[in-house]
Regions:
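Alpha-solenoid helical repeat scaffolds
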Residues: 6, 22-26, 95-98
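Active-site acidic short loop of glycosyltransferases
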Residues: 18, 146-148
Length: 158
């Protein structure tokens, strides 16, 4: 919501310490990433499906994201995640609620996977190299199939 975004902006500028600032930057990065994802999603929905989101989140929220530029939101999210990695990577990001600690790792450990996903695992990006053995025992590399449509099916029995 705009109110939450305003609060995060205040926390980032308030000089309340690296922990508060870093957590606020990370929260804003996650917010922008979510907004970019929803902005893309909302532009593809039928009016009936869109109405479900309007009922859940409010028509103003849906309209704001429909009008938003998802590319700009994604670029801002990437910048914010990178800032967390560059400036707050070592800050403890564990969450303490009612005297119990929920281990979440450092802020850098929380931001790095999102940054990796945005830079390497998004639509239009070249997939990372995969080397494995197929079901027939033959070694293969994903790059052997470059230029071809490939479906990867990961499964296992744990």
């Amino acid at each position: 919501s705009p109110s939450m975004e305003k609060l995060l902006g205040i926390l980032i500028k308030a000089e309340l310490g690296r922990g508060v600032e870093g957590a606020a930057v990370l929260a804003l990065a996650k917010t922008r990433k979510g907004q970019a994802d929803r902005a893309n999603q909302f532009k593809q929905l039928t009016p009936e499906r869109l109405e479900l989101y309007e009922n859940a989140y409010g028509a103003d929220y849906v309209a704001r994201l429909q009008a938003a530029d998802a590319t700009t939101l994604l670029a801002e999210a990437e910048q914010l995640f990178q800032r967390v990695v560059d400036e707050f990577a070592d800050v403890n990001g564990d969450l303490v609620l009612n005297g119990r600690t929920l281990p979440r790792g450092t802020l850098g450990e929380q931001a790095a996977p999102a940054l990796f996903e945005m830079n390497n695992l998004s639509v239009g990006k070249v997939a990372p190299e995969i080397a494995a053995e197929d079901i027939g025992g033959v070694d293969f590399k994903l790059s052997d199939y470059r230029g071809k449509v490939v479906m990867l099916d990961f499964w296992g029995h744990w």
